[in-house]
Amino acid sequence: MAGNGALRRSAREKCWEARDAYFGCLDRHSILDGLKDDTKAAQACSAEKTAFETDCVKSWVNYFLKFRVQQHQQQEAIKKLEAQGAKKLN
């Protein structure tokens, strides 16, 4: 989606759908970081990547890709702590 203007709800939903499809493809090909592994991601998920980059503002694409990695790292850290006996605080 070109431009820096505010996205309408339908445009945001289209972006989110494209993001989810791209991330689903990355998951199927065991690719976590779409930025670091850009070449591999482009080969495995070219149609989904193109749709994601077309339907979302560039800053959103970068944000979503970085957030995906951060979220994974956070989940891995939680699993490690739980394996060491850490308890969740309420």
Curated annotation (Swiss-Prot):
Disulfide bonds join C15-C56, C25-C45. The lineage of its organism: Eukaryota, Fungi, Dikarya, Ascomycota, Taphrinomycotina. GO terms for cellular component: mitochondrial intermembrane space; nucleus. Involved in cytochrome c oxidase complex assembly and is required for efficient formation of respiratory supercomplexes comprised of complexes III and IV. Keywords: Cytoplasm, Disulfide bond, Mitochondrion, Nucleus. InterPro entries: COA6_fun, COX6B-like, CX6/COA6-like_sf. This is Cytochrome c oxidase subunit 6B-like protein new16. Gene3D superfamilies: Cytochrome c oxidase, subunit VIb (1.10.10.140). The gene is new16. A motif (Cx10C motif) lies at residues 45-56. PROSITE patterns: CHCH. It is found in: Cytoplasm; Nucleus; Mitochondrion intermembrane space. One of its GO terms (biological process) is mitochondrial cytochrome c oxidase assembly. It holds the Pfam family COX6B. Residues 12-64 form the CHCH domain. A motif (Cx9C motif) lies at residues 15-25. Belongs to the cytochrome c oxidase subunit 6B family.
